[in-house]
């Protein structure tokens, strides 16, 4: 049974004098208090109130401002609007304009509303009938290109081609580029107000939008904010990934609206790169939605002319000229602060960054992602973590740094954190590693040459600990990281090497230690410091074979992430249809599950 913090009663119902008040005042009253007996929470700042009201109206949660009524709202309507936004965004549904809600409102996103926009005259929503193209062959062209971008015209066109191909690969739609002025899908890079009713707002905020199919002159047109720093395989892990945003917007252009499903490409918030354009596949629920509109693509039309795919990436002299950030580590020449299996995937943390491997050990990106952009709620000044693990009792993720720890539900920090590590009966000073051993379902914490055994189900430390390391013969007495993997084995990391202990065993498997960089992070022997000679196949006992590069995917000296780390897929790993590929989303708790807002939300 989950332990939940006690919660007071909700806000009291409004009395006659509160039933209708000007919205800013009502926000202060409704959002500054959590319960009738609780102490008032800090009142939102005036600029936050203004942001909240404008944002909720802009994206369909509240009617737009009406000067004839003074924009009056009831407390109930306002609380419902905030609750709906929180549910759609994967936050705890409190109905309160708290810090997490404001942070999500400030996250870059698509310009289109999440819900059918309300009006003052009609407060009941009626979901519009889905629109779709009544033809199968659609033309497209890039009418205007980004003006001050390191991405060349050919790269932009290539990214548009592959983003459209994501949809035509599974649905009976054929996209072809045209050079003339007439095209079904016109693509523009614009700034500020560009006369379509969806003005852009500078860097961040709204980054792009597209129009649904129909008979209007803008049907299918797709616009990107030219004030954004558009990137592709950026070396500094910053900017807006153009391919990821384009896939989302072209979903609108063929008729799909926003959804709250956790790993859908059609969630409204920007979540970062989605991987290699030549290998990216849509999450399952997005496939189902487009199949419902157009049916399943069975074969290529015999009358369709073959179109030569553009090359990716572009030559080196047309890539980003921005210097790489000095604090970004290289995966092939470092040890890691923490390693964890989360939702069946491997996360390697170093400094403010992390790398991610899917269930079948595909490296999502050769470049690391920023930790704070993925795990919402970690302090911005946090420059590293000590240990991370996923609790087996409730599948929440625990981060440790020094004397404090944080608990996350999916990508969002739980209320009330950070808390002291003394909650675990651990001494002050932090830990070196943490992992849950599959053999006994206990969590082990390591510090220097000591280890503790903890029961996450009862939230108590087992008696008799700490004990002297190591429990497993052959494992170093001091560790950097530890993790259990989907194959049932436990993996221990120190420096640039790792040790493998098979499920239920108390000693290291033969042939270890081996190179972490080579076997997990797709580094060659010449790249990984301290790498060792190849061993036999993992099925025979020692380690997995070295990672493999797809040789056809190295172009113009530019390393492309179509790579697989050493081991074959663990038993029961999902196939490519259900494996989550978006960099900034957690996969579902069970393979193939449609992880909807009612279950566990995170875009």
From Swiss-Prot:
Residues 36-125, 566-603 form a propeptide. The precursor is cleaved by a furin endopeptidase. InterPro entries: Hemopexin-like_dom, Hemopexin-like_dom_sf, Hemopexin-like_repeat, M10A_MMP, MetalloPept_cat_dom_sf, Pept_M10_metallopeptidase, Pept_M10A, Peptidase_Metallo. GO terms for molecular function: enzyme activator activity; metalloaminopeptidase activity; metalloendopeptidase activity; zinc ion binding. Its cofactor is Zn(2+); Ca(2+). Disulfide bonds join 332-523. Hemopexin repeats lie at residues 333-378, 382-427, 428-475, 476-523. Binds 1 zinc ion per subunit. Pfam families: Hemopexin, Peptidase_M10, PG_binding_1. A motif (Cysteine switch) lies at residues 108-115. It comes from the Eukaryota. Glycans are attached at residues 137, 318. Residues 301-329, 537-571 are annotated as: Disordered. Residues 1-35 form the signal peptide. One of its GO terms (biological process) is drinking behavior. Expressed in brain, leukocytes, colon, ovary testis and breast cancer. Expressed also in many transformed and non-transformed cell types. Zn(2+) binds at residues 110, 248, 252, 258. Endopeptidase that degrades various components of the extracellular matrix, such as fibrin. May be involved in the activation of membrane-bound precursors of growth factors or inflammatory mediators, such as tumor necrosis factor-alpha. May also be involved in tumoral process. Cleaves pro-TNF-alpha at the '74-Ala-|-Gln-75' site. Not obvious if able to proteolytically activate progelatinase A. Does not hydrolyze collagen types I, II, III, IV and V, gelatin, fibronectin, laminin, decorin nor alpha1-antitrypsin. Belongs to the peptidase M10A family. This is Matrix metalloproteinase-17.
């Amino acid at each position: 049974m989950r332990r939940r913090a006690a919660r007071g009663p909700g806000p009291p119902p409004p009395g006659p004098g509160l039933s209708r008040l000007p919205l800013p005042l009502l926000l202060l009253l409704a959002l500054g208090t959590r319960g009738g007996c609780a102490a008032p929470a800090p009142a939102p700042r005036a600029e936050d109130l203004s942001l909240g009201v404008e944002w909720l109206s802009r994206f369909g949660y509240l009617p737009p401002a009406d000067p004839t009524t003074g924009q009056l709202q009831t407390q109930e309507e306002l609380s419902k609007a905030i609750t709906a936004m929180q549910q759609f965004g994967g936050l705890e549904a409190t109905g309160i304009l708290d810090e997490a809600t404001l942070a999500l409102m400030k996250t870059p996103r698509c310009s289109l509303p999440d819900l059918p926009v309300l009006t003052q005259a009609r407060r009941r929503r009626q979901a519009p009938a889905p629109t779709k193209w009544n033809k199968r062959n659609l033309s497209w062209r890039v009418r205007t290109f980004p003006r001050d971008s390191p991405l060349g015209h050919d790269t932009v066109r290539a990214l548009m081609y592959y983003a459209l191909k994501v949809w035509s690969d599974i649905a009976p739609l054929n996209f072809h580029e045209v050079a003339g002025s007439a095209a079904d899908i016109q693509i523009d890079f614009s700034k500020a107000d560009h006369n379509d009713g969806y003005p852009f707002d500078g860097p961040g905020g709204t980054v792009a939008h597209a129009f649904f199919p129909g008979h209007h002159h803008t049907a299918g047109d797709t616009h990107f904010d030219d004030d954004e720093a558009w990137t592709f395989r950026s070396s500094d892990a910053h900017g807006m990934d153009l391919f990821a945003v384009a896939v989302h917007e072209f979903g609108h252009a063929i008729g799909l609206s926003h959804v709250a499903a956790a790993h859908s490409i059609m969630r409204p918030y920007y979540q970062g790169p989605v991987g290699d354009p030549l290998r990216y596949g849509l999450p399952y629920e997005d496939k189902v939605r487009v199949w419902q509109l157009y049916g399943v693509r069975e074969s290529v039309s015999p009358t369709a002319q073959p179109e030569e795919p553009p090359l990716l990436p572009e030559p080196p002299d047309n890539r980003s000229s921005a210097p790489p950030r000095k604090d970004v580590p290289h995966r092939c020449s470092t040890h890691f602060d923490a390693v964890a299996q989360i939702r069946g995937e491997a996360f390697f943390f170093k400094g403010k960054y992390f790398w991610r491997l899917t269930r079948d050990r595909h490296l999502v990106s050769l470049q690391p992602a920023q930790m704070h952009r993925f795990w919402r709620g970690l302090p911005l000044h946090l420059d590293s973590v000590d240990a991370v693990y996923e609790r087996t009792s409730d599948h929440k993720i625990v981060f440790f740094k020094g004397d404090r720890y944080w608990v996350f539900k999916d990508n969002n920090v739980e209320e009330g954190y950070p808390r002291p590590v003394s909650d675990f009966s651990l001494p002050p000073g932090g830990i070196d590693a943490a992992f849950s051993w599959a053999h006994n379902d206990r969590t082990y914490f390591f510090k220097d040459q000591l280890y503790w055994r903890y029961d996450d189900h009862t939230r108590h430390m087992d008696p008799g600990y700490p004990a002297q390391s190591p429990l497993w013969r052959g494992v170093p007495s001091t560790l950097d990281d530890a993790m259990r993997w989907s194959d049932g084995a436990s993996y221990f990391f120190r420096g640039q090497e790792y040790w493998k202990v098979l499920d239920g065993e108390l000693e290291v498997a033969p042939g270890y230690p081996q190179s972490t960089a080579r076997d997990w992070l797709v580094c060659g022997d010449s790249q990984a410091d301290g790498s060792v000679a190849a061993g036999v196949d993992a099925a025979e006992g020692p380690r997995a074979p070295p990672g493999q590069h797809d040789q056809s995917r190295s172009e113009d000296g530019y390393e492309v992430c179509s790579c697989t780390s050493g081991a074959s897929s663990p038993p029961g790993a999902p196939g490519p249809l259900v494996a989550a590929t978006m960099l900034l989303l957690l996969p579902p708790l069970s393979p193939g599950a449609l992880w909807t807002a009612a279950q566990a939300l995170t875009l």
